[in-house]
Amino acid sequence: MSPDLDTPLIIALDYPRLDQALAMAERLDPSRCRVKVGKELFTRTGPRVLEALHGLGFEVFLDLKFHDIPNTVAGAVEAAADHGVWMVNVHAGGGRRMMEAARERLERRRLGTHLIAVTVLTSMERDDLIEVGVEAEPLSQVERLARLAQQSGMAGVVCSAQEAAALRATCGDDFLKVTPGIRPRASSADDQRRTLTPGEAMAAGSTHLVVGRPVTQAPDPMAALATIERELAEPS
C-alpha cells in the first residue's frame, strides 16, 4: 500500500463479473483514484479480483461489511488484510467486542489495512430504522455508532455526506469519514438517499468519497473523474 496516494476518490466497481470489473479498472488511473470491491463481485470471483486489481496498481477498499461473532469477524478481517487490501469494513452494530477483536487481530499481526465501521446504511431513512426497532433519528444513530467505533479503535466510519460535519465535531478531523452516494452536479440520486456533491461532501468533513455510476457509466470514465477533480479543486 502506497502512503503517497493523495486522492479522496474511490471508484466503486459494482459489476457481477471479473472481466467487467477489470475492463473498467483498465480505463482508470491508479495514481488518481482507489477502487472499491463489494459483495457481489467478491462473492462471484473471490480473491482473484483483488490480485488482479493489485496487479494493475490499485489500492482496494474491500467493502464486505462483516457482521458476526467477534472471533469470526477478526478472522475475516485478518484474511482481507492478508490479501493486501487498503481498507476493509465491519458493521458497528456488531458491537464493541466485535470491533475490538478485529482491531486487535490486525495489530497483533502488524497489518496496516485501514479498518473502518459502517454506521447506518445510506439507503436507510427514519421509517426504515423504525421498522428494524431503532427509534432514534438517523443522525443520532450514526453519531452513537461512530462514537462506539472510535472508542473501539476503528480508523473511521462510512457515513453519508450530511452526517460528516456532525461526525467531524464528534470524532475529530483525523477520524476517517468515507462517504458513498456521491453524485457530481446534475447526476441523479439513484438508490442512495442521503447524497451531496463531491465538493459539498468534502466541505462538510468527508475524507474519502465513493463514486460509482457517474464514472463507471460515463462514455469516458477518466474524463468524468477529471470533472470531479475540478469540482473538488474549486473554492468552497
Swiss-Prot record:
One cellular component (GO) term of this entry: cytosol
User: Which positions are annotated as binding substrate?
Assistant: 14, 36, 63-72, 122, 183, 192, 212-213
The task this protein performs is described as: Catalyzes the decarboxylation of orotidine 5'-monophosphate (OMP) to uridine 5'-monophosphate (UMP).
Q: Which gene encodes it?
A: pyrF
Part of which pathway?
Answer: Pyrimidine metabolism; UMP biosynthesis via de novo pathway; UMP from orotate: step 2/2
GO biological process terms on file = 'de novo' pyrimidine nucleobase biosynthetic process; 'de novo' UMP biosynthetic process
The protein's name: Orotidine 5'-phosphate decarboxylase
Keyword Metal-binding present in the record's keywords: the answer is no
Reactions this protein catalyses = orotidine 5'-phosphate + H(+) = UMP + CO2
